[in-house]
């Protein structure tokens, strides 16, 4: 065969756009991205075949996951489950389960530096005393994650990034006039850890209407959120979204996916 030639179009270089609390596509499908890079937000539709693991945004803005596949009904459910883990019947046999509460498709905002997609298998070697090299290798675990440094620290975003936080917003008449509107994150006490999908979209340098898309179907934010306040530099903080298995999906597609539009 001839000597290989490097292909510049296969070398990726480009910034990322990060979205939090997103839907997972049906297994074998890909998250749809518009020509401008905007992710599609799937909604319920009538008389459609759905499979376990597929997600939609319901009429209340919460994310529902199909846990029993089939064909959706001719009309949408009157009431959607609005507590994580609550099931909703749809048509003759489809069951949706509330997977995450809104806001859905929250844009993470400005990023600093590198955004890392880590796809890692834990491999253990099998050895034999008769051999100096391992005689086999077996996968025993998996660690997949997306890590990034964020710059925008409004509480609307922090509600998805502080696992034990509770978000609220409103108006407080005790505050000074002109500064009575507020948003806050309260923390302290045992509560369930939010788990949701994370989507990273990066534009190709050679094809401005095509993208590389990385997604983790279900993740939790594992880092301590450290918010430095100083005069000389803007506040930044690092977050890591650690994948967990979505057991409603088939083996081989339970963690996430990366695909490149060609």
Regions found by a protein language model. Give the residues of each.
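Tryptophan-rich substrate-binding surfaces of secreted polymer-degrading and adhesive proteins
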Residues: 38-102
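Beta-strand-rich interaction surfaces with strong enrichment in secreted/lumenal proteins
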Residues: 134-136, 203, 226-229
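Short acidic, glycine/tyrosine-flanked loop/strand segments centered on an H-E-D-like triad
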Residues: 124, 130-131, 150-152, 157, ...
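Polar/acidic, low-complexity leader/linker segments enriched in S/T/G and N/D
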Residues: 1-39, 100-108, 262
């Amino acid at each position: 065969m001839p000597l290989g030639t490097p292909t510049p179009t296969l070398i990726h270089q480009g910034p990322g756009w990060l979205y939090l609390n997103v839907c997972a596509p049906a297994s074998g499908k890909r998250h749809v991205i518009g020509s401008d890079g905007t992710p599609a937000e799937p909604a319920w539709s009538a008389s459609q075949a759905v499979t376990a693991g597929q997600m939609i945004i319901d009429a209340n803005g919460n994310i529902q996951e199909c846990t029993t596949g089939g064909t959706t009904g001719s009309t949408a459910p009157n009431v959607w489950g609005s507590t994580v883990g609550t099931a909703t019947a749809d048509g003759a046999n489809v069951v949706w389960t509330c997977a995450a509460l809104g806001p859905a498709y929250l844009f993470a905002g400005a990023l600093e530096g590198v955004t890392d997609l880590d796809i890692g298998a834990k491999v253990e070697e099998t050895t034999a005393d008769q051999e100096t090299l391992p005689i086999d290798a077996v996968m025993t675990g998996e660690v997949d994650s997306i890590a990034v440094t964020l710059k925008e620290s409004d509480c609307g975003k922090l509600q998805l990034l502080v696992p034990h936080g509770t978000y609220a917003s409103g108006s407080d008449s005790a505050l000074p006039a002109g500064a009575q509107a507020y948003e806050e994150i309260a923390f302290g006490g045992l509560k369930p850890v939010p788990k949701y999908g994370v989507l990273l979209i990066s534009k190709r340098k050679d094809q401005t209407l095509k993208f590389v898309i990385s997604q983790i179907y279900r993740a939790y934010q594992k880092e301590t959120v450290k918010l430095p306040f100083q005069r000389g530099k803007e506040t930044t903080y690092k977050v890591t979204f650690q994948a967990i298995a979505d057991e409603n999906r088939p083996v081989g597609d339970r963690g996430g996916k990366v695909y490149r539009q060609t």
